[in-house]
Design a protein with these regions (language model features):
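Outer membrane beta-barrel
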Residues: 1-85, 135-172
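Outer-membrane beta-barrel pore domains
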Residues: 10, 77-88, 92-231
C-alpha cells in the first residue's frame, strides 16, 4: 500500500512488500524485495525517509532492519536535478558464513552538468559488531552522457562505471546491480541504453578489468544485453 497523507503529496506512507534500494541510490548492498513500513517527506528541496522491516532476498533474507535517509536537491540550468544524500541502516547482516549485527553508514552525490552529463558517486561502510567479522567499505562511481527515458522514444545514454567493494560490503544474491559479482569485486564497466518505443528499452552492459578485491585475481568478465518493458 502506498498512500499520501496530505493533499500536497509531501507526506507518504508505504506498507507491505516493496522494492527497497538500500541508500536510495545504486542499491549495491541490497536492491530487492522488502517487507516493511516506510514514512517519507519530500518537497522540491529535500527528502527525509525512515522505515523498518525485513529483507526478503539473498543472504539477508528475513533479517530485520531500521533505516533512515536524508537527501537534498539543488541546482539550476544544466545543474538542475542534482542531489546529495546520506543514509544509515541497523540490521542483522550476513557475510559469507559469518552473521551478526551490523550498521551501514553511507553517502552519495549525483551531479548534473554540461547539459547532458551526470556524475553519480557513492561511498559507504559496513560496521560489523562481531569482532570476528571485518568491517567492509564500498565505493562506486558512474559517469553518464544523455538520458534514456521510458516515456521518450529514441532517447538514449552512454555510461562508464567503476566499483571497489570489499568482502562483506554487498549481498550478491540481493543486490540491485546488474553485475553477477559485486561483493569482493573491483573493476570497470561500460554500457548504453536506448528507448526504441514508449515503455520499451534496450540495455547493454560490458565489464572489463574485473578483479577479486581481496586478492587482485581476475574475475570472469560479463557481457549482457536485455530488453526492459515497463507498464
Amino acid at each position: 500500500m502506498n498512500y499520501a497523507l496530505d493533499n500536497g503529496h509531501k507526506w507518504n506512507v508505504m506498507v507491505g512488500r516493496y522494492d527497497y534500494e538500500l541508500g536510495n541510490n545504486m542499491g549495491l548492498i541490497y536492491g530487492n524485495n522488502f517487507d516493511g513500513a516506510q514514512l517519507k517527506f519530500a518537497d522540491n528541496k529535500m527528502a527525509a525517509t525512515v522505515g523498518y522491516g525485513k529483507f526478503k532476498e539473498g543472504d539477508l533474507n528475513d533479517s530485520k532492519t531500521a533505516y533512515g535517509e536524508l537527501e537534498g536537491f539543488f541546482g539550476g540550468g544544466s545543474v538542475a536535478g542534482s542531489a546529495v544524500g546520506v543514509y544509515y541502516n541497523d540490521f542483522n547482516a550476513s557475510s559469507g558464513v559469518s552473521a551478526g549485527d551490523a550498521k551501514v553508514w553511507g553517502a552519495y552525490a549525483s551531479l548534473n552538468f554540461a547539459k547532458k552529463f551526470n556524475l553519480n558517486a557513492e561511498a559507504y561502510r559496513v560496521n560489523y559488531d562481531k569482532a570476528s567479522v571485518a568491517d567492509a567499505d564500498g565505493f562506486s562511481a558512474k559517469l553518464k552522457y544523455g538520458k534514456a527515458k521510458f516515456d521518450t522514444p529514441k532517447s538514449w545514454d552512454l555510461w562508464v562505471n567503476y566499483i571497489n567493494i570489499e568482502d562483506g560490503a554487498a549481498d550478491d544474491s540481493g543486490t540491485g546491480s546488474w553485475r553477477t559479482n559485486v561483493n569482493n569485486t573491483k573493476g570497470w564497466a561500460a554500457g548504453a541504453d536506448y528507448t526504441f518505443a514508449k515503455n520499451a528499452q534496450l540495455q547493454v552492459f560490458q565489464t572489463f578489468d574485473t578483479k577479486i578485491e581481496k586478492t587482485g585475481k581476475d574475475r570472469d568478465e560479463l557481457t549482457r544485453a536485455q530488453f526492459v518493458f515497463v507498464f
